[in-house]
Amino acid sequence: HPIQNLFQPSLVLDM
């Protein structure tokens, strides 16, 4: 994934 799990796990999965 482009970004690490800095905010929400869902965000990372979406990206």
Swiss-Prot record:
Its main location: secreted. It is found in: Secreted, Extracellular space, Extracellular matrix, Interphotoreceptor matrix. GO terms for cellular component: extracellular region; interphotoreceptor matrix. Keywords: Extracellular matrix, Secreted, Transport, Vitamin A. Transmembrane segments: none annotated. GO terms for molecular function: retinal binding. It comes from the Eukaryota. IRBP shuttles 11-cis and all trans retinoids between the retinol isomerase in the pigment epithelium and the visual pigments in the photoreceptor cells of the retina. This is Retinol-binding protein 3. It comes from Cricetidae sp. The lineage of its organism: Eukaryota, Metazoa, Chordata, Craniata, Vertebrata.
